[in-house]
Curated annotation (Swiss-Prot):
Its EC number is 3.6.4.12. Residues 482-647 form the Helicase ATP-binding domain. This is Nuclear protein STH1/NPS1. The gene is STH1. Keywords: ATP-binding, Bromodomain, Cell cycle, Chromatin regulator, Helicase, Hydrolase, Nucleotide-binding, Nucleus, Phosphoprotein, Transcription, Transcription regulation. Residues 1108-1126 have a biased composition (Polar residues). Residues 795-956 form the Helicase C-terminal domain. Changing residue 881 to M: Temperature-sensitive. Altered cell cycle distribution. One of its GO terms (molecular function) is histone H4 reader activity. It comes from Saccharomyces cerevisiae (strain ATCC 204508 / S288c) (Baker's yeast). Residues 1257-1357 form the Bromo domain. It catalyses: ATP + H2O = ADP + phosphate + H(+). Residues 307-383 form the HSA domain. Gene3D superfamilies: 1.20.5.170, Bromodomain-like, P-loop containing nucleotide triphosphate hydrolases, Tandem AAA-ATPase domain.
Amino acid sequence: MLQEQSELMSTVMNNTPTTVAALAAVAAASETNGKLGSEEQPEITIPKPRSSAQLEQLLYRYRAIQNHPKENKLEIKAIEDTFRNISRDQDIYETKLDTLRKSIDKGFQYDEDLLNKHLVALQLLEKDTDVPDYFLDLPDTKNDNTTAIEVDYSEKKPIKISADFNAKAKSLGLESKFSNATKTALGDPDTEIRISARISNRINELERLPANLGTYSLDDCLEFITKDDLSSRMDTFKIKALVELKSLKLLTKQKSIRQKLINNVASQAHHNIPYLRDSPFTAAAQRSVQIRSKVIVPQTVRLAEELERQQLLEKRKKERNLHLQKINSIIDFIKERQSEQWSRQERCFQFGRLGASLHNQMEKDEQKRIERTAKQRLAALKSNDEEAYLKLLDQTKDTRITQLLRQTNSFLDSLSEAVRAQQNEAKILHGEEVQPITDEEREKTDYYEVAHRIKEKIDKQPSILVGGTLKEYQLRGLEWMVSLYNNHLNGILADEMGLGKTIQSISLITYLYEVKKDIGPFLVIVPLSTITNWTLEFEKWAPSLNTIIYKGTPNQRHSLQHQIRVGNFDVLLTTYEYIIKDKSLLSKHDWAHMIIDEGHRMKNAQSKLSFTISHYYRTRNRLILTGTPLQNNLPELWALLNFVLPKIFNSAKTFEDWFNTPFANTGTQEKLELTEEETLLIIRRLHKVLRPFLLRRLKKEVEKDLPDKVEKVIKCKLSGLQQQLYQQMLKHNALFVGAGTEGATKGGIKGLNNKIMQLRKICNHPFVFDEVEGVVNPSRGNSDLLFRVAGKFELLDRVLPKFKASGHRVLMFFQMTQVMDIMEDFLRMKDLKYMRLDGSTKTEERTEMLNAFNAPDSDYFCFLLSTRAGGLGLNLQTADTVIIFDTDWNPHQDLQAQDRAHRIGQKNEVRILRLITTDSVEEVILERAMQKLDIDGKVIQAGKFDNKSTAEEQEAFLRRLIESETNRDDDDKAELDDDELNDTLARSADEKILFDKIDKERMNQERADAKAQGLRVPPPRLIQLDELPKVFREDIEEHFKKEDSEPLGRIRQKKRVYYDDGLTEEQFLEAVEDDNMSLEDAIKKRREARERRRLRQNGTKENEIETLENTPEASETSLIENNSFTAAVDEETNADKETTASRSKRRSSRKKRTISIVTAEDKENTQEESTSQENGGAKVEEEVKSSSVEIINGSESKKKKPKLTVKIKLNKTTVLENNDGKRAEEKPESKSPAKKTAAKKTKTKSKSLGIFPTVEKLVEEMREQLDEVDSHPRTSIFEKLPSKRDYPDYFKVIEKPMAIDIILKNCKNGTYKTLEEVRQALQTMFENARFYNEEGSWVYVDADKLNEFTDEWFKEHSS
């Protein structure tokens, strides 16, 4: 019965949802049946109940719907069909059961007791509990009908295993040693253990019972309750189980309460129980019963003392009150006096404030008067009224401006005198008469009129100039050059590029040849890249002149030398290189005129070209042609002026001091700001200096129909990858590319030099670093990553298709060829046809490329050029868009690049786009370039050196530049979105519409591509941080900390700042040319040597004392005085000088010490000494070994007064030198250290020479080991250490670099004394090679092969 109830409960728990769902479905079908009516009768099949609970629910449902048979006819039919199926199954079951019962033997007896034992045993086994022995000793019950095989066990007796430990111990004679053990009085422990175990097991069983345990009674079925009613005994078993569980859990509490109760009753019984408390035995145990209370009796003496104490307190209180009253009166008096004093001070302060306000008002009035006067002076200066300006300046008494004006006037006067001197010198050479100038004429002389005193009007070009007709501005340029010629001066023709400086120079030569009858010879010096163009121009414009083109191979030049020697030519056209190479031939002529093209090459007055021309060549006139007369600073402009007019501009310092002040905003901590008046005054004086000797016209002035040139600065964002790399390089001067990456250190760090250059590379494109591309794009294929990782490429990805669609052609200028390689991949990916020209392009290829690009129907869209190689001598006006990918430090290089397209012949507006990365080093470079252009604008452009602009125009232009410098707006800081970019790029409204359309098409294509990849939105155009590989997203501070050295001590070391490198010019050049040493190492080496020299001079060594304390004899002091030596000691030594001198005589008996005196002349040898120390040599000069005092000749010392350093060394031989030149040597008891050192060296050297031939033989055999593939010597890579410049990280990663030459050197000088040390050094060399190079590389393989060879060699020679 219990089993059936449990089965019923489990069935209800497990299958109730299924039956409920089935009944719900039947109910829904019944409702649907009622709605359908008689139209159609669907059949419903109810699944058979799988438990009695489901059957009961089906009965409940059947009873419930019997009251409404019409509405539930279909459901009733389905339930009755189910009941029929159940009845049929029951009949089948009973039939099978009867068949089974009939098959059982009639004589079989059912043993209920045995079955119960079997069940109990199974339950015990289920709980992993041992079965008791009496369960195992069951009688053997066999069925008579069953047949068994009888086995004879007579031969084999089973082994009896006893579980009784005591019995087994007793049988073995192992009785317990504790014979006096007493049994517990509270029962059997085994019984207690079994009871506790059963209680815990029962608690576990009750806790594991399900929470939804319920009981179902058949009485409720008979009462026909609905399914929503709860059973009357639903929670009976659950409550009983909870009561039993809580009762069992109370057992511990009951035990503790019982223990407390027993303890409390037993311990408090004699206090709480009356008859025990009143017992005499209990009372006797209490001490209080036996003690009598003490009676306190007052004493008279104590009373008297108390009264005396009270009187004393009252007396003191009165005295204190009197004292307080006196102090309060004093305080009141002081407060009264203070208030009176404060009121007096307040009146004084008020009077002072009135006086100060009066003085401030007077100062303001005076300031207004000064400003009003300054404005009047400025107005007079602008109106060019010099007399009024000087009068106002004299009234103002402005000493600063007066001094400035006086100095500039003196400089202009000196220049005027120099101009006259040069003109007079030229006149004397030509035999003309020199007219003296009076003082009155000197004061009224105009500087420009002095220079161009002789004027000559030119209306037509020379007849032998037949190549074409000169334009008006070219005739004016010819007229200016002829005026210089007439006035015996030289000048600079600085017309903007494209205005025909070449033609004007040829016209000057033809004019002098035809009109002035000056038959030359003329020398024209040009760059090699433009000599072809000059040759063509001479052939076209002046074919009648006998022109020699001096260039080519030595044989070609040799064939022309005879013609040059005899002077059978009119013009010699050559290059800078041959001017220097063949100066012995070319400098023999007295040249009539020297013309130098691209004259900014002469900006360095100390260059070899300037030196050669100035010192070897003789010429009557000089002319410099340059489109950029001022590229960086004013001294470069002075260098050009000094070259053409050496007599006039002969002091660079004077020129820079007076005219560089308004532009030199750096160089001192306190910046000297000039007022607008001072700036105008200085610049006007500078214009006065330059105007006679410099002519510059701009294309926009002389060619009015030339289209405009519009330059726009486009700001580009940094991608996530660029930001990470930029911060790494900025903070650590290195990149973290992950451990194991080729080219990086063991920790994955790639150290780099020249931080600014590396930052520029990162701004251009991160893939310039191969290690970065290997991590981000391992396949190195062309994909969207090319523009997603770089902001500039992302911008070009949006811009270039628009230019292509609108028919514009693009010139793109770069500073780095690596970026050009990446751009080529990008253009190929975008299917844009391009051409490339850089420094490696040959001259003949350049001409072909220019012709192909400039062809009328050329299909080339883009021309990639390097700024330095493609910025000169190219005509590319068929393109109308120039993109400056990265800005050059020299802004004139970018201007030259822009003028490739903006030149005469251009028909479209030229749009210049300069790409600048936001918040990067490129902004600093651009700012610096703008400063250089600003100087050029103020000095050159504002001068309007075209000989026709008025003073008002010059002043207006100059004022506009100065105002724009102070009020420069930063409206181009933010990056441009698509709409703003289209506004910038579009040259018309139609292009704006076209560009907007292209942007929409691009966005639609990006959405389609994202959808094809399964993305909801397109990825950002620039790669983000979360898309980068893990290497670039982790915190790299720890990696860089590992590379750094450990800090020394707890005190932070101060960083030492050096303001020079300490190298001479020769040492600097040697360091630059040395491949085995970087410039930083050379500077560091030089500083260490200088520090050692300083310590040696000060005497601060480990075994030296910086005092003169122990001078042994008085004769030594007199010796120093007689030879006029002065000892140079530290401040501490000087402080104790008198004391130590007095003690010297008394200490003569102490051990002798060495005094080493080093004169200032020894400093010449410090470089050699430091070099020998750094190389590890132990060289000691013989003079130092043999003598302790080095003294120079007395006569020389008296003249030069050399500074001496006195060094006192302990435990050394003392050598004294008397006035007569004799030496006295005092030897210590022990052997001389010098002899010991010499003996030790001799012994070491002889021992090292013993192994050196053997090692040399080993090296020779190693060098004979050749590779099987290409037969290269395996030792070739190990001969010397790699270059520090090429492999700077090698010396950071490898702790002990080693090479064959180092091993041979160490063997030769005795560092290695045994073959074992040589073997270890070779092993170190091979380990370094295997550690630094990848496994499988040829260096790695060579190291393994050589290692095997040396191991075999050492085994043979060790035996």
